[in-house]
Amino acid sequence: MRKIKVNGIIFLISLISCLFLGGNTALAKENPNTIEFLSYDEEILILRSNGETVLISEGDNVEGIIEGINKENLKEIDLLVLRSMEEETDELIKTFINKSSVKKILLPTLNGVSEEVSNLTNEKNIEIASMEEGFNYNKESISLNAKKVETSKEGMIFATVDNIKLAVLSEESYDSAINLSNIEDCRVEILNLIDSEKENKKEVKKLVKRLKPLVIIDDLDNGKSIEKLGVKYYNLNEEKGLKIMRVLGESKEFKVLSKKEGYTSK
């Protein structure tokens, strides 16, 4: 009888908890750790945690990045990561520094950074770092490591947010990522392929097999090939509205937002 009574009390407590917390949905809303994929004429990736914001971008559209920052009300960015070096990189950094508050900037290489930008970052006390020798960033719920791809001006980025692993790669990064030897566990839950139009799908398949992602977000025209591998597929540029992806069945929110629907976060 005592055992039945105890079990009944536990059941009631569980039921009340579900009613008040609203199940996984309420828990997800309370979770401060998010990974957001946004399109504002420039694909930007925002990692957020308690008091920590990391913005990752391709780095070739100043207006798109600034629009995303304004719409998402990003008043302070702890780390800005530009995944590739473009002709517009200098202009982007200057505009970014003047219109937003950033503590640290990460580039694939410091070669090509103008003296004007170097002076400006020194004046504003902003640290500027390179991926060439490898880069590590570790905070309470966000960790990130990046490495420059040899013979190119691009970088490959691996991040972990609340134990969810994310890889940010482009066409130039495929071969390097497949042969990674300096990262013990290359498996990722989310694979983000930026600005990739590779005609040969073999490299993509090898990369997917190597990293074994649960979710792929890309702009490749090979959805069918990837779907055959049993991986969920999203095309960021064609996505409509707001999507919430549940990864590993846990209560973490990963947002795919599209500018086309006129979505503005509150």
Language model region names:
Residues 22-79, 128-187, 193, 199, ...:
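Core dinuclear metal-dependent hydrolase active-site scaffold
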Residues 102-107, 126-131, 233-236:
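Short hydrophobic/aromatic-enriched beta-strand-loop microsegments
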Residues 210, 214, 221-224, 235-243, ...:
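CN hydrolase (nitrilase-like) catalytic-core segments centered on the catalytic cysteine
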Residues 29, 47-48, 97, 115-121, ...:
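Short loop/helix-cap segments at secondary-structure boundaries that form the rim of catalytic
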Residues 68, 92, 96, 113-126, ...:
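Short, aromatic/basic amphipathic alpha-helical patches
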Residues 1-28:
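Sec-dependent N-terminal signal peptides of Gram-positive bacterial secreted proteins and lipoproteins
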Residues 61-108, 179-217:
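Active-site metal-binding motif and surrounding structural segment of the metallo-beta-lactamase
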Residues 42, 109-115, 133, 219-224:
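Short, polar loop motifs at secondary-structure junctions
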